[in-house]
Amino acid sequence: MAASNRNTIGKFGLLSMTFAAVFSFNNVINNNIHLGVASSPVFLVATIIYFIPFCLIIAEFVSLNRNSEAGVYAWVKSALGGRWAFITAYTYWFVNLFFFTALLPRVIAYASYAFLGYDYVFTPLTTAIISIFLFAFSTYISNSGAKLLGPMTSVTSSLMLLLTFSYIVLAGAAVLGGIEPADPINVQAMTPNFNWAFLGITAWIFQAAGGAESVAVYVNDVKGGSRAFVKVIIVSGLFIGVLYSVSSLLINVFVHRADLHFTGGTVQVFEGLSAHFGLPTVLMNRFVGIVSFTAMFGSLLMWTAAPVKIFFTEIPKGIFGEKTIRLNRHGVPTRAAWIQFFIVIPLMLIPTLGSSSVQDLMNTLINMTAAASMLPPLFIMLAYLNLRLKYDRVARDFKMGSRLQGIAIVSVLIAIFTVGFFASTFPTGASIMTIVFYNVGGLVVFLGYAWWKYNRYAKSLSAEARYHEDMPLARLALEAQEGAQAGQSVLTTPACNKPM
């Protein structure tokens, strides 16, 4: 019955889903603050060399696991076994913990614009404390089930896209009309300065171009199959890259790059636009603030519940306690959600110790979020490399090019991501205490805990169960496939003439 519901997503539907999953105006603001209009060509390159190939990698894993509703755990287990599948799924969850720290201050800033009409500036410590109370509230709401979350997020996302297109059209018209941009738009300004700081910011760019894993899972549901999927993904990637590039090119038409804030940058650029066209800025601030606040708060509620539910229900039973993974009547693991809340508290408070302003705090939080977000795709790429190296003969409906092409493409991506990860983990100008105790310390503690937790689980298994848990599923599939082929060969071999 389930099979009859497949192949129901049209090309335009997939294009819309891809756009909604990947594009965010806040990503334009974040990267403009560091790179200026030089982020414009970098965005386009990132979508071509990362987003499109990574989508195809995920699509191949989905094709490999087409008989199951595969997730990150299943994809990596198929090529690397259970241990690395758990580590990868775990990194996706703990990246989300850092994501909360960057999202919560934005919710506060946009609430200020929505209700006051301007950004009320708090100290870093006050911002962190308010963020903690806000996260406690969102955890409580998410555990209770948010019925209106889907419709609210859909409406606000549509409004944000409408605002984005409106800004591009109006800012472009202003430039064509002869306005002198606040910051120059020329070849020199668009040329990145290739240094260690730039390599660190590439993590922000790749994070902005992420979202492939949420789109590529639908490769089996697209009308026209894998060929149609590949065409749409390439078109989507180019479209998103162009939109990011054009937005980045026009973001400083009305507002200087140096004046933009990580928290309320979206409102700032629309305030500049409204001032140029003679529109009431206070009303514009409130409108954009309300739309942004609603979208951010909806995103907060969704991400508070969804990742923790997916992670704790996808991994094998026995790694965490039964009470931790038990679902309430709304389908949310309540205890795990509150554990998530208590972990975020020190992640919010520690960076305030070395931050003189909310802008400094946000720089640290976004940088660490971007650095951590490099790990899950990196593990998936390593799994894919192992798949093409050792198990490429496993039958599947879709492959990203030949074996050599797949290995070459993913090897380049692994090299880029490795450099970007280290450059963002050890950024220039950051406090050595922040780097040691937050950037490095946070990763060591979280990954070390995951490794220890899996070792305890593995020791509790029998030798046979441990063998099957750590065995890549692709290896089992290949052995079964070759066994079937050998049996078929025996059946089809002509019988030899026997001596009388």
Task: Briefly describe each language-model feature range.
Residues N7, P41, V121-T126, S154-G289, ...:
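Helix-loop-helix junctions that connect adjacent transmembrane segments
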Residues A111, A128-E180, G210, I233-L238, ...:
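Membrane-interface loop-to-helix entry segments
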Residues S4-N5, L327-H330, M374-T425:
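C-terminal membrane-solvent junction of multi-pass transporters and transport-like membrane proteins
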Residues T91-R106, A216-Y218, L279-E322, P377-Y384:
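Membrane-helix boundary/coupling elements in multi-pass transport proteins
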Residues K77, L104-T127, L163, D221-G225, ...:
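Helix-loop-helix connectors at the membrane interface of multi-pass transporters/channels
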Residues A74-W75, G81, V235-L301, F320-T369:
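TM-loop-TM module centered on a large, flexible mid-protein loop between adjacent transmembrane helices
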Residues L56-E60, S68-F135, T139-N143, M296-I310, ...:
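Hydrophobic transmembrane alpha-helices that form the core helical bundles
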Residues M1-S40, V45, F51-A59, N67, ...:
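Membrane-interface "cap" regions at the ends of multi-pass membrane proteins
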